[in-house]
């Protein structure tokens, strides 16, 4: 698995990782207090969960908060709330995709995949509110701002949730690749990646019309689109099973070779692919379309990195080249991207 530790040579990313580590400890401490006296017991934070590898996206968001010059007390609050957002999204994805990527570790039975995710949502709701009450007590926010943050915590992820709901139970159409990217994936993932900016924008710590803020938002949105294309490559088999929108499926359907189109049709007709069919590597059956999807995903990520650099992240041309080289290594084995998706 490629590492992103080269970023730790940059002081901004070291500072941002330390901030995220503090957030995780704060989150764990709140969980411990809330679970005290219950029948569910919290386990210690795994050391690996404090690494850059496990918190790559969260660290990126915090680094952007610094670049956008958000005052330290508010930045700390937004980083805490963003971790709650991460927990909600991860748990909801688990329920929608019938999988388990844990963000809270308890002594609940290993087989309890569904309830673990339900419990994460319930517990995170209370942690989120406790973080708000702490900020209110410390006069970091006022009562009206508590109300704003409660509202924005739902509305910021509702666009993505609406798209997930539209696809639940399966879809029968196959939009063109450009429609998948600019409509479906923009709603599902593009806006979701930009959601961490919603709270500071709502409270006036970021001016959405200011040039740097626009670059940050556009960069996050584009980064989300690139990540979703990678997600679609590794999720090809599952999305065929569930009849969900998928960029690679769209490429095959609208632009694929005759052979690739025929293979895709056969997979739909066969139905119910299992894990034994190598779902994470099914893209290899469609080499030409997969190569195009990788190129399109790379293009989106390169565009995002340029935006991040222009808005002030210390990503020089050399750093961006290193970044892309690492990402390309991931792209050559898209099934590995599965392990980065909840970061």
Briefly describe each language-model feature range.
Residues 19-36, 45-60, 118-230, 234-240, ...:
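All-alpha helical catalytic cores of prenyl diphosphate-utilizing isoprenoid enzymes
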Residues 63, 90-112, 124, 166-170, ...:
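Acidic, Mg2+-coordinating active-site segments of isoprenoid diphosphate-utilizing enzymes
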Residues 71-77, 142-145, 209-212, 293, ...:
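Residue-level recognition of alpha-helical structural elements
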Residues 84, 88, 121, 217-219, ...:
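Small-residue hotspots
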Residues 122-144, 255-307:
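Primarily interfacial, aromatic-capped hydrophobic alpha-helices that serve as membrane anchors
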Residues 291-343:
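Short hairpin/turn module used for nucleic-acid contact or packing/dimerization
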């Amino acid at each position: 698995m490629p590492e992103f530790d080269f970023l730790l040579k940059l002081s901004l990313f070291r500072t941002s990782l330390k901030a995220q580590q503090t957030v995780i400890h704060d989150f764990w401490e709140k969980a411990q207090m809330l679970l005290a006296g219950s029948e569910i017991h919290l386990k210690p934070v795994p050391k690996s969960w404090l690494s850059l590898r496990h918190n790559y996206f969260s660290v990126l968001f915090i680094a952007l908060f610094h670049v956008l010059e958000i005052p330290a007390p508010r930045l700390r609050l937004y980083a805490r709330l963003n971790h709650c957002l991460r927990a909600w999204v991860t748990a909801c994805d688990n329920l929608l995709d019938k999988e388990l990527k844990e963000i809270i570790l308890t002594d609940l039975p290993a087989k309890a995949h569904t309830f673990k995710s339900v419990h994460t949502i319930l517990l995170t709701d209370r942690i989120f509110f406790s973080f708000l009450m702490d900020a209110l007590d410390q006069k970091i926010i006022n009562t009206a701002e508590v109300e704003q943050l409660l509202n924005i915590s739902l509305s910021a992820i509702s666009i993505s949730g609406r798209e997930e709901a539209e696809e639940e139970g399966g879809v029968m159409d196959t939009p063109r690749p450009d429609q998948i990217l600019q409509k479906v994936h923009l709603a599902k993932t593009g806006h979701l990646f930009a959601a961490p900016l919603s709270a500071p924008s709502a409270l006036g710590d970021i001016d959405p019309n200011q040039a740097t803020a626009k670059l940050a938002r556009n960069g996050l949105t584009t980064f989300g689109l690139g990540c979703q294309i990678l997600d679609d490559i590794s999720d090809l088999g599952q999305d065929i099973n569930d009849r969900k929108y998928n960029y690679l499926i769209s490429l095959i359907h609208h632009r694929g070779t005759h052979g690739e189109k025929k293979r895709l049709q056969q997979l739909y007709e066969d139905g119910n692919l299992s894990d034994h069919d190598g779902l994470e590597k099914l893209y290899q059956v469609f080499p030409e379309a997969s190569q195009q999807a990788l190129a399109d995903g790379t293009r989106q990520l390169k565009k995002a990195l340029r935006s991040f650099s222009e808005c002030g992240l210390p990503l020089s041309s050399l750093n961006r080249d290193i970044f892309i080289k690492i990402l390309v290594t991931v792209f050559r084995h898209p099934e590995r991207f599965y392990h980065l998706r909840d970061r």
